[in-house]
Amino acid sequence: MKPYFIKTPILFKFLFSNWVWRLSSKEKVLYLTFDDGPTPGITEWTLNELRKYKAKATFFCIGKNIGEHPEIFQKIIEENHAVGNHTNNHLNGWKTKTAAYLQNIEESEKYFEEYATLKAVTLSAVEGQNLKLFRPPYGRLSFSQSKKIRKMGYKIIMWDVLSADFDTEISNEKCLENVIRNIENGSIIVFHDSIKASEKLKFVLPKVLEYYSYQGFNFRSIE
C-alpha cells in the first residue's frame, strides 16, 4: 500500500485553500463521508447504522454505480443524506487529461440528474445556482482540473481524517484508531461503502457512531 496521511497536514490545507478540508465548528459536530458507492448490501448496511443514531452523512457516489443501482442511490436521498459527485469511473486526476476528466464528471452528472430528487444537495438551488459537491478519487487533482471544476459550480470537498478502511494491510483495530485519535470538532472523515473496505467499515462505523453519540456529538451532512 502506498503511503498516505491519516490526518491531513496543515500545509496541504494552506496550499489548496479553495478546497474544503474541515468545517470549523465550536459545536460537537462531525461529518461522516462515504466514497465509491452505491454498493449493494454495503450501502444499505451503512444507511441502517446511520439511522440507529439519527446520523446524517454525505455519500460521494460514482456515476456508473448510480446507473447500475439507482434504487440504492434514491434510498440515500430519501433518508435525507447529502450526495456528491465522485466521477463516473473513479478516475485518478493525476493520470487523466483535464478535458477527459471534466467529461467524466459530466457523464456522472447525468446519473445524478436522472435519479436524484429535489431533496438531493447536489441539485438544491442556492441563490439561483446549483449547489454541487465533488470529491476527487484518491484526492488527486491538478490545478487546472480544480479551477475548471469550481467554474462548473462545484464545491470541492476533501477531508481532515482518513480512516484508511481501504488498506488491506492494516487491522480493523488500527483503522478504528486512525479515526478516534484524529477527530476534532468539525472533522470531515472518509469511509468507503465499497466491497474492498466493507470488513473494516463494519467494524469501525458502529463503534464511531456509538462512542461519539455518547460523547454528545451530532453527525451532519455537508451542505
Kindly give the residue locations of the regions a language model identified.
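A cross-domain feature marking catalytic cores of carbohydrate-active enzymes
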Residues: F34-D36, C61-K64, N85-T87, P136-Y138, ...
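Short histidine/acidic/glycine/proline-rich micro-motifs that form metal-
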Residues: G63-I66, H90-N92, R140, L162-D167, ...
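His/Asp/Glu-enriched short active-site or ligand-binding loop at hydrolase and phosphoryl-transfer sites
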Residues: R140-R181, G216-E223
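Active-site beta->alpha N-cap acidic-glycine motif
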Residues: P3-W94, A100, N104-E114
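Short gly/ser/thr-rich secondary-structure transition/capping motifs
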Residues: F12-N18, P137-Y138, E169-I170
